Amino acid sequence: MSENLFGLTVAADKGLDDLQCQRLLSENRRYQEVMLQYRCALKALESRLEILNEEFSLQHDRNPIESMKSRLKSPSSIMNKMQKRGLSLDFPTMQANIMDIAGVRVICSFEEDVFFLAKCLKDQSDIEIITEKDYISHPKPNGYRSLHLTIRLPVFFAEKEIHVPVEIQLRTIAMDFWASLEHTIRYKKNLPINAEIETELKECADSSREWDSKMEQLLHILT
């Protein structure tokens, strides 16, 4: 069998866990080179967001960003996603088709801050918007709200410029509170979710939407 995405076809067949895969990957130079691109893309995006945050703070005397959290998809998650989609397990295929290897979650103070930051990023001439999914204006049936952007931005190395995809999730504190606890209830407990609990979760999502609306109204009254 030909070498797979991480040179780990045999390892994957043996069912090695993610930590064991990481140890093997630490010796795989090609993997390290590719992941460096995604790590640097995260740093570049975080730097742009920090600049926007500081500029907004200077102009409006408050920060639109409460916190940021970045992550790289694990090797096993990447491989599983590619296998489910029937993709060839090699680096060019991975880079052309898997757009969420690098991800940033941005927690904002108010709903209007989410759209402000999204617009600022979209207005930057060297950023390409791959996809945009507005689950704030159009929440998912379960009540989930967030703004998802998949972008491609340039990363400058010593001898080359590479445009790397990054997934961005922008949401308010209330949206993140609901999404985090809903995920814990739905997935971490590994228990079936009945219709009554689904209804309760949706009602909580509706309440969080009301909180965002009321807080934004208060902000405008006081400013």
Residue map of PLM features:
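An acidic, glycine-/histidine-flanked metal-binding catalytic module
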Residues: S2-L42, E46-E55, V166-T223
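Glycine-rich, low-complexity intrinsically disordered segments
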Residues: K14, E33-Q37, P64-M68, M94-Q95, ...
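Generic alpha-helical secondary structure
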Residues: V34, Y38, L42, P75, ...
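Solvent-exposed loop and beta-edge segments used for protein-protein assembly and interaction
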Residues: A41, I98-D100, G143
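Generic solvent-exposed, charged/amphipathic alpha-helical segments
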Residues: L42, E46, E50, M79, ...
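A glycine-rich, hydrophobic loop/mini-helix early in the fold
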Residues: E55, H60-I101
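Long beta-strand-rich cores associated with HINT superfamily self-processing modules
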Residues: Q95, C108-M215
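Terminal, regulation- and interaction-focused segments at domain boundaries
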Residues: I101-I107
